[in-house]
Swiss-Prot record:
PANTHER family, alphabetized: URIDINE KINASE (PTHR10285)
SUPFAM superfamilies cross-referenced by the UniProt entry: P-loop containing nucleoside triphosphate hydrolases
Pathway named in the protein's UniProt entry: Cofactor biosynthesis; coenzyme A biosynthesis; CoA from (R)-pantothenate: step 1/5
UniProt enzyme class: transferase
Protein's name according to its UniProt entry: Pantothenate kinase
Pfam family, one: PRK
Keyword Repeat: no
């Protein structure tokens, strides 16, 4: 059934077909820059950037340009200049699918187009309730589920930047302490484009209770991307990443997960599998994957994190 829905809604491109749509867009990313951009456990190459992300940056540049031209037409009609409003691109998908890497690559490529040199990247992690609040609400085991986010604060932020407000503060999140930072903020100062990356950015007001319904992130997004992969791959990638964190971030005494640093491979693998089966997997099945067909573009990953298919809304 899902395939028939996708066939009706999307144009499908195999990797080679999509790569041809790059046309003459030059590759301006070096191997050293790519190393800094890619996430843990991702075998990302310049070929992947050339075949997948350059055509995507070309598409987005054309779409953003059309939106900017439309804005000029509206300004002319109203005989006044409206406040600068950023073009907002959202990137959704499961834990461990590589959303952050996709976001960083697109940010780097898009800001090298002269039409929109200022591109900011915002992650919704900063809008998770503080750790103490999650514990108080009994939501620690549902972290990442829609109810664990301060959607009011997130909505206020996205509304402010879309309205053209300047110097809008965004809360930051520490993956070491597993908590929102209280003394640091990201400041958004009227960029040309905002890339908003998070698990549930395709969620709509229809997904919430009627009495709490309010404008949601998706109401303000101009272009949405969903990074997709089979759950068996996602679980495997999550377990691999957990094992790598055990030798890296978990060794930091400040880490919320420091107690996992001394686990054996077998113990760590079992705990990671349990976290997936009880938290990340159910969240994917109940809240994240059902929003996939709301995206304007779906990037379908296969083994080794390589994108094998691109689906674009008709």
């Amino acid at each position: 059934m899902a395939n028939s829905i996708q066939d009706a809604l999307y144009l499908s491109f195999e990797r080679e077909q999509w790569a041809e749509l790059r046309k003459s867009v030059p590759l301006t990313l070096s191997e050293a820059e790519l190393t800094q951009l890619k996430g843990m456990n991702e075998k990302l190459s310049l070929d992947e950037v050339t075949d997948i992300y350059l055509p995507l940056s070309r598409l987005l540049n054309l779409i953003v340009g059309a939106k900017q031209q439309r804005g000029l037409v509206i300004d002319k009609f109203l005989s006044q200049q409206a406040p600068k409003s950023p073009y907002i691109i959202s990137i959704a998908g499961s834990v461990a699918v590589g959303k952050s890497t996709t976001a960083r690559i697109l940010q780097t490529l898009l800001q090298r187009w002269p039409e929109h040199p200022k591109v900011d990247l915002v992650t919704t992690d900063g809008f998770l309730y503080p750790l103490a609040e999650l514990k108080r609400k009994g939501l620690l085991q549902r972290k990442g589920f829609p109810e664990s986010y301060d959607t009011k604060l997130l909505g206020e932020f996205i509304s402010a930047v879309k309205s053209g407000d300047n110097n809008v503060k965004v809360p930051l999140y520490s993956h070491i302490t597993y908590d929102r930072l209280t003394d640091q903020h990201q400041v958004i100062a009227q960029p040309d484009i905002i890339i908003l990356e998070g698990l549930n950015v395709l969620q709509t007001g229809l997904d919430t209770l009627v009495e709490t319904r309010r404008p949601f992130v998706s109401d303000f997004v101009d272009f949405s991307i969903y990074v997709d992969a089979d759950e068996s791959l996602l679980k495997d990638w999550y377990q691999q990443r957990f094992l790598q964190f055990r030798h890296g971030a978990f060794n930091d005494p400040r880490s919320f997960f420091h107690h996992y640093a001394t686990l054996s491979d077998g113990e760590a693998n079992a705990i990671a599998a349990n976290i997936w089966d009880t938290i990340n997997g159910p969240n994917l099945q109940l809240n994240i994957q059902p929003t996939r067909e709301r995206a304007k573009l779906i990037l379908k990953k296969g083994k080794d994190h390589l994108i094998s298919q691109v689906l674009m809304r008709r």
